[in-house]
Structure formats: C-alpha cells, structure tokens
Amino acid sequence: MTSPEDTAGVEAALAAEGFSPTDVRAVMCMTESDGFGRGYASLAFAHAFAPALGCPPEDVAQQIPMIMIGGCSGLVTPYAAVFVDDPASSWVTDGSGGGLSIGVTTTATLNPLDVGTPAMVDAVADAVRSAMAAAGIDKVADVHNVQIKTPWPSSAALLDGPLSGLDAGSVGAMARAAGALGVAVALGEVSRADITADVFLRDPNLRSDVASVSAGTERVDAAVLVMGNSPTSASPYRIGHGVLRDGIDPHGVLDALRAVGIDSGWPFTADTTPVEHVFLKSAVDGTDECRGRRHVLRTDYLGPYSWLLGKAVVHATVASIVGDPMMQVSGGGEHQGPPGGGTVAVIAR
C-alpha cells in the first residue's frame, strides 16, 4: 500500500485471480496512520467494495470484517491481506488434513457502557465460539489466532458508566483487555469465574496466547476473525502459533514455524522463506525491563510512544528469522501474551 487509502493493489489482485469483493471474507491492513483509532483505511475499502456488494459504504463492515492496524514503526511494511472464498478451488481433503480455516462473525451492537467490562467479555466469548463453529473447528487446540476489532467509545459516550473519567487511551486499553479476556474464556485459557471488573489491566496471569485485539472508533460491535486448522478444510495452508517471552525471544516464532511443519532452514531470506503471513501482537512495552536489564521504553522522552517502539523491536526480531518485513504487528497487548513479550502466529503452505 502506498498510503492508507490505497485500495488499488487489492482490487487489482482480486481481479487478476478472478475474485470480486463478494468473495472476500475479511481484510487486514498495516497502515501508516497514527494507531489511535483514527485511521481511514477501513473507510477507503468500504467505498471500494460497496458497489459490488450492493450496499452503502457504511454497511460494508457488517459483511466483511476489516481489521486495520495503524502505526508502521521501524521497518514494518504497509500492506493489505485479504481472505477469500474460492468456490472453484481444485483442492481436496481426505478428512484428515487440518488445513487453514477461518470463521468470521460480529457481536451484537455493544452498549458503550459495556465496553471494557465483564459484559463485553461474555459477548466476545460467545462470538468466538460462533466463529469457531463457522470455521469447522471443534477443538480449541486447533485455534491459533483470533483477530478482534472492538469499539473505542468516546469519553462523552461513557458518562456515568464504569469507565467514566478515563482518558481516551485508557478506554482503548480496557476495550482491548475485554476482547482478549473474551477470547481466553472462549478457549478455556481463563475461567469465567475469574473475570471480575477489578482484574482488567491488573492481573497479567489472566491472558490469551492467541488473541490479537485492536480498538477503533468506527465500530459499534466487535468483529471477530478466528483462524485455525480444520480437518474439513481443503486449504493447502496451515497456521501455528507461539509465545514471545520478551521482545528479543526467537523461540516463539520458531515454535510457530515448527507447528506448521517447518523444522529447519532459518533464518530465511526473502527468496527462501516458506512463510505466507505472520501475525504479531506486541506487549513489549508492558514492563520496564528485559531479561533483568532496565529499559526506558516507557520513561524517556518518547515514552508516550512506547507501544510504537515496542512494535518495532518485536518486528525486527521476527522479521530477521522469517526473512520478510511484511507482517501484521499490533501493539496494545493487554492480556495478550506475557507482559514484556507477545504472541506470534504463522501461516505457511
């Protein structure tokens, strides 16, 4: 993508492969917006897809989840990734396969006062279960990445609610926390009985190792995209995941590679990499040290941008192994992987 509003590459790629927007299941982007919920890539894609879908642009997101991540720090490549249905595919499965499968859904419209609360956890958990069913995934162990875009209500919408008085950044953090805990509950990573209002942003032991949650002002519901492997899928792709213990941990991505059958050959180059896509969630700025050494991500003059700097760190670590800087890198890792680290998922053929 040459800019956040650049949809030409996606439109050309769809046309070249004989697809149209009606075949699109989900869109993900890395854009050079500010990352604070004010990006406009989703609006550009909505206008591009609306004519083919036969609906006004404002309704496109109800048909096609759009998960746009702003902030291309370091060497992160701005790009768009599109998931499509291919009814003409010649791929076959013998039922034993475990090919890549995705399921998409949305929650009902969320009351702004429920955002960042246990009520939102329940709504997201139900949506994750529905998306798993849509993907043909029966076992939670076969789920390797759950992308969620939650609402990011304005301060005015939160008056007299449980988040009243919080600044905009804190509201976004609570929304992401609720989304992540919803995934954790749905997949059995956390017991629902442990979810109370006072654990949000306070108990890092309550977390999901496959969730990747972002928040946006454009949503009034939570969009959910579950990615995993299903024995009913004929896809030649597989997905696996790992956990990054800190920002310079190579073992998380190596675990993800092994999970898709790649046991050797790293570090790869752009010409040799077997990796099709990587999804990273950074929680690098969740602590003030790395392996016992103090760092100043949160305390020097760039402290307000610690989330952005953390993304650059973890991106460099993973890109140096997979051999490609084009990958999704999302900050705001509340309850997503261990503080100071993050999560990674890899799709390979």
From Swiss-Prot:
HAMAP family, per database record: Cyc_amidohydrol
Family per record: Belongs to the cyclic amide hydrolase (CyAH) family.
MF-aspect GO terms: hydrolase activity, acting on carbon-nitrogen (but not peptide) bonds, in cyclic amides
Active-site residue list: K149, S214
Organism: Rhodococcus sp
UniProt name for this protein: Cyclic amide hydrolase
Enzyme class, spelled out: hydrolase
Keyword Ion transport: no
Site (Important for substrate specificity): S306
Record's keyword terms, sorted: Hydrolase, Plasmid
EC number(s) on file: 3.5.2.-
Subunit structure comment from the entry: Homotetramer.
Location of the region described as RU A in the Swiss-Prot/TrEMBL record: 1-90
